[in-house]
């Protein structure tokens, strides 16, 4: 375990070259006395497998201007990584729920399939799944395939990028699993980090053009508990009768190694994939770094004067 501060000044504990599941993380971090991680009275919650095909990049006004000016993404603060997160869609939740039910109850009848009510979205309440942003008022959402293709052409001379298990980072209430994407030309530089494999027991893997994410803690605030009725081959979300429990939540970050390059996209694609986000609470960016919707509309019109399409708002999963 190593300690440090991230670029925003927050204390962090991290384990390089590993994606530690919560059981292992609790053991590794037992001396830290993290009151959220070490909680034991957490209601039962589902462990789905999400097949994610989109990435998101949140930013504030200053970042948006830079992205438009350069028509792409570069690392701030003289760094070498451009950071994205997995962007889970409503279809991803629906598919994950179906897989979870099929795996748990493989012998369901057609009648039981039809009786089953949707439940998984009630557990998808952590910031990982939110339409709100902790980082700024602007969110770019791109197909994963498009990002990787642009990275391949611009940073890898057309070759396939390499993916590695970069690290696990623990904050007070947040666990971040980081995947590193780099050029084959930098194999030696990152050889100390294991390759990201298609391991069905891992927190995250990559297969067939998508990230397969198995969230360790998808709720943050536990308002529901998973109710399993094996005699009926059914699952449901039951309301928690006692006070709601707060727990750690996890997410997956994808760090693209670009050096001092700009990962470029067509300006029209940037505009099409841009949406406005309301501020999450608590936020990471400063309060004055967020903008209201009218301010955002004006800025986007200024930066894309030839595009008259209205600025859309990020929408909730539910």
Model feature map: region roles:
Residues 2-318:
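NAD-dependent ADP-ribosyltransferases
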């Amino acid at each position: 375990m190593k300690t440090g501060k991230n670029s925003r000044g927050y204390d962090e504990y991290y384990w390089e070259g590993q994606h530690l599941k919560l059981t292992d993380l609790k053991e590794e971090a037992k001396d830290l006395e993290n009151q959220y991680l070490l909680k034991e009275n957490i209601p039962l919650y589902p462990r789905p497998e999400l097949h994610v095909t989109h990435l998101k990049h949140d930013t504030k006004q200053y970042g948006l201007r830079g992205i438009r000016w350069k028509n792409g993404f570069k690392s701030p603060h003289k760094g070498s990584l451009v950071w994205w997160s997995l962007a889970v869609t409503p279809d991803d939740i629906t598919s994950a729920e179906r897989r979870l039910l099929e795996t748990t109850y493989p012998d369901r009848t057609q009648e039981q399939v039809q009786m089953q009510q949707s439940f998984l979205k009630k557990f998808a309440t952590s910031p990982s799944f939110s339409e709100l942003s902790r980082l700024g008022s602007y969110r770019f959402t791109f197909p994963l395939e498009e990002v990787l293709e642009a990275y391949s052409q611009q940073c890898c001379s057309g070759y396939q990028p390499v993916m590695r298990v970069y690290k696990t980072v623990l904050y007070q209430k947040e666990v971040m699993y980081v995947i590193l994407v780099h050029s084959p030309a930098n194999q030696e530089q990152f050889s100390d980090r294991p390759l990201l494999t298609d391991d069905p027991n891992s927190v995250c893997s990559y297969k067939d053009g998508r990230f397969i994410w198995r969230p360790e803690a998808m709720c943050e605030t536990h308002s529901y508990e998973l109710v399993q009725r094996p005699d009926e081959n059914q699952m449901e979300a039951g309301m928690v009768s006692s006070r709601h429990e707060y727990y750690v939540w996890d997410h997956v970050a994808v760090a693209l190694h670009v050096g001092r390059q700009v990962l470029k996209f067509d300006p029209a694609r940037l505009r099409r994939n841009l949406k406005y986000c309301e501020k999450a609470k608590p936020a990471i960016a400063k309060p004055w770094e967020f903008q209201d919707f009218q301010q955002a509309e004006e800025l986007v019109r200024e930066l894309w004067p030839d595009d008259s399409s209205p600025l859309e708002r990020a929408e909730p999963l539910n």
